Amino acid sequence: MNKYLIFRTDKIGDFLISAILIKSIRRNDPDSFINVIASKENYNYIKSFKIVDKVTLLTKGILSKLKLINLLRKEKYNTIIVHDGKRRSILISLFLKTNFKIVSNANLNISYFSDIKKMLNLLNFSFDKADLNTLNNRTYVSLDNLENNYILLHFDEKWIHKEYISNYINIEPSEKELVSFFNLLVNKTNK
């Protein structure tokens, strides 16, 4: 079994780009083990993805990073991918022995998809457009136990607590459903 360690220590939207890479790895190497190093901002969200076997939290402080390095050394990963391009991730990866290491070029004005395709080529893996749909590989929190109906309008993740997304479902309404909803909302508020 091949073991992959992927660094994604930034925000949720950045992880969604990495989810494409992870889904491609999983499709090409279905028996693999994938561990994602996450930040406190995206840790809970990443845990909800079925395509990720383990999520490890990267915390602040030199001592915690040294403990993390020791923990990761024991795991013995075949491939390490620094997809966030952060110096701290690159530095941690330098202390880890592996057969193969890839550092993202995302900070060099290269398209994210070009970067992902390049990484997949380095791994001798193929890219499939179906890998772009990553949300179907997520375990959503059940809302069956709610006593009252409610509506949540959410326009930007900066409006709500940093870990908000781990508790909500993205329903992706069609234009017709959205217009119908707003008409219903207008009718109810005008009474």
Annotate each PLM feature.
Residues 1-191:
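Catalytic machinery of carbohydrate-active enzymes
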